[in-house]
């Protein structure tokens, strides 16, 4: 069973959570893209929802599927957000931001009554940190900000390197908000809460990819032979 099949299986399990009339946060990334396609089918069959996208890429995908959209200015409180994750541990702590949408993803998730993660089971880890942790930073003073971020990482008991992210063309990547991303290649994060607090204390840090105390459940799809087996962390 391929990775796209597993992502679709996780997305399929999330679709019944979407009820008529819901205000829905819609995530970014390949698993969220599978969810958007399935949601579009439901909308064309008569389901009435209003979505708030977490990136320009998600907005375009939703418009292609005919999903009605709004902003958090229109709908400041959402019923549910469905989004992917780069890593999730047993306490539902996440690393997100591989798709460079972490700022909008966190704003939308926190504006929601519930957040449910969809992912293939390879994203379930014992300790966060194997996936690089994205830190979104202002372009002004980026050299000083990078040094301060590295000092915060050391104080939190982590080691590794800090790399500015580039896009597919090789140019420094800019987020939808016009910020840079520093990827922290740490290997493991022994105390995510301490690292989160340390990063927040750095002027110039706009957001980071640790989502702590935000997700309510995670739907994880694993391959078992030719079939997908779906499990749930937390409560749907």
Curated annotation (Swiss-Prot):
Coiled-coil portions: none
Binding residue positions for substrate: 28-31, 83-86, 96-99, 123
Pfam families in the cross-refs: Rib_5-P_isom_A
Domain of life: Bacteria
Pathway(s) per entry: Carbohydrate degradation; pentose phosphate pathway; D-ribose 5-phosphate from D-ribulose 5-phosphate (non-oxidative stage): step 1/1
Enzyme Commission number(s) of this protein: 5.3.1.6
BP GO annotations: pentose-phosphate shunt, non-oxidative branch
Single GO MF annotation: ribose-5-phosphate isomerase activity
Keyword entries, A-Z: Isomerase
Assembly description: Homodimer.
Alphabetical list of HAMAP family matching this protein: Rib_5P_isom_A (MF_00170)
Protein's recorded name: Ribose-5-phosphate isomerase A
Organism: Methylorubrum extorquens (strain PA1)
